[in-house]
Regions:
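Bacterial N-terminal signal peptides
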Residues: 8-17
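Acidic/His- and Gly-rich active-site-bordering loop/insert found
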Residues: 48-181, 190-194, 198-207
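Metal-dependent amide/peptide-bond hydrolase catalytic core
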Residues: 51, 295-487
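Divalent metal-coordination and catalytic microenvironments
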Residues: 68, 75, 96, 134, ...
């Protein structure tokens, strides 16, 4: 999943670069860093929170177990695309079984089969529902679910590392592509396994039921739906809390960043098929030009955010594709606009979708053209909402474990993540997702000092500082789980 930059240039990076004081936050970067024990203070008053003293050194992080390093390298070199995670899921299931979990595989199989038949009319070889659920019971207490995603991306790796992926495969819809773990899911899985090991080793510190799930197809926003539709909450212990982490490509390894409340956005895809009447470019009066109509739609759509969304709320309406015509002197019969729509609040989301429909139809009518065909993709990714109370508990515990100077609050982002689905059932289960910094601290400091961008998630150049990131993920997630088991 694509994530915008999460963290501003911390004093840590400036210290490493030889600077003695911090710069003001750049536009789009975090404007506040709240104390881990009072994450809601700033948002409640609308005032910026007081910045705590920043770290002046790189956090010391112990090396992960050598078997976990080997696991990471194995996963990175053998990435699998969405709904094709057969070997990956089998490996994770085997690891959970060795730890004493009750393990069930193939979660979501029927849903995936039905989806493939509906969308492309067939089930391609190797496509399936590869969800894994592991259950470990440890006396009476809360049930805590910890999720990892498994799928890689159709991206050619260009990192130059010795363990780079050279895998080529087909997407679940049949498109040939190179494959790379360009979004850190290999780190997620390794930290997830390390967390399972840590919690098994520390069973004396918690009571309850631990549910570890490995989810397919996060990158296409469908894996959580598949697992929930296959009875995740009915066939297995229903969680009292859900936890997940994600790497950050713009935070130094050894750190954790988080956003209470809305953390990530609703993600909708909308297609607008503009219908006109084609003809010769020299005689436009005899046509209904869909390119002109489409251009008016693109311009008018911008008023939705600027004049319909509360300035204190956030929303994005982006036209990512405008396709029409094939020759200089031919006015085509149609044009197609492809939109991505981002929001946090459900009411704002609905207002945007209604507004897109209204504007597209009105602009077509103004040109006396046929009504456009508007398709809103039903399988959207809902916004990720971090339960404030659970987030406060989790972050306070992580701050004690890592050191509060290495745990930072950041602004929510407009990226999407289908972990949100687990909190969207009628049970409204409190859920928390936090980010783990994945950039080598020295590289992070140099990039910030030089004003140079870092390789982003989904980039063919993204190569995380994997050992420090994996261990920080283990430390943070196992601490979070033990805290929530205290209920």
């Amino acid at each position: 999943m694509l994530r915008p930059a999460l963290v501003s240039a911390l004093a840590l990076s400036l210290a490493l670069a030889g600077c003695s004081k911090t710069d003001a936050s750049a536009p789009g970067e975090p404007t506040r860093i709240a104390d881990t024990g009072s994450s809601q203070a700033a948002s409640a008053t609308g005032e910026a929170a007081v910045l705590p003293a920043a770290a002046t050194s790189v956090r010391e992080v112990g090396a992960p177990e050598s078997s976990l390093v080997e696991m990471y390298l194995k996963l990175h070199q053998a990435p699998e695309l969405s709904f094709k995670e057969a070997r990956t899921s089998a490996l994770l299931a085997q690891e959970l079984q060795s730890l004493g979990f009750e393990v069930t595989t193939g979660i979501g199989q029927q849903w995936v089969t039905d989806k493939a038949m509906k969308d492309i009319g067939e089930v391609k070889p190797g496509v399936g529902g590869y969800g894994v659920v592991g259950v470990l019971r440890n006396g009476n207490g809360p049930t805590v679910l910890i999720r990892t995603d498994m799928d890689a991306l159709p991206v050619p790796e260009q990192t130059g590392v010795s363990y780079a992926s050279t895998v080529e495969s087909q997407t679940w819809t049949g498109v040939d592509s190179p494959v790379m773990h360009a979004c850190g899911h290999d780190v997620h899985m390794t930290s997830w396994l390390g967390t399972a090991r840590a919690l098994v080793a520390q069973k004396s510190k918690w009571k309850g039921t631990l549910v570890m799930i490995a989810q397919p197809a996060e990158e296409i926003g469908l894996g959580a739906q598949a697992m929930l539709a296959d009875g995740l909450y009915e066939r297995f212990p229903k969680p009292d809390y859900n936890l997940a982490l994600h790497v950050s490509a713009d935070a130094p390894s050894g750190t954790v960043v988080y956003s209470p409340g809305y953390a990530m956005a609703n993600v909708d895809s909308v297609d607008i098929h503009v219908k006109g009447k084609g003809g010769h470019g020299a005689y436009p009066q005899a046509t209904r030009d869909p390119i002109l109509i489409g251009a008016h739609i693109v311009t008018a759509l911008q008023s939705l955010v600027s004049r319909n969304v509360d300035p204190l709320d956030s929303a994005v309406v982006t036209v990512g594709s405008f396709k029409a015509g094939a020759k200089h002197n031919i006015i085509p019969d149609e044009a197609v606009l492809l939109l991505t729509v981002r929001s946090y609040d459900d009411d704002t989301r609905q207002m945007l979708l209604d507004g897109i429909t209204r504007i597209a139809k009105a602009e077509a009518a103004a040109f006396d053209a046929p009504e456009p065909e508007i398709t809103i993709e039903p399988d959207y990714t809902p916004s990720t909402y971090n339960d404030p109370a659970a987030t406060t508990r989790v972050i306070k515990a992580i701050g004690k474990k890592l050191g509060t100077e290495y745990v930072r609050e950041v602004n929510p982002v407009m990226g999407g993540e289908d972990f949100s689905q687990y909190a969207r059932t009628e049970d409204k289960i409190p859920s928390v997702l936090f980010w783990v910094g994945a950039v080598d601290p020295a590289k992070y400091a140099k990039a910030k000092a030089d004003g140079m961008p870092l390789p982003s998630l989904h980039s063919s150049l993204f190569a995380p500082d994997y050992e420090r990131t994996i261990q920080t993920g283990i430390d943070a997630m196992s601490t979070a789980a033990i805290e929530l088991f205290k209920d």
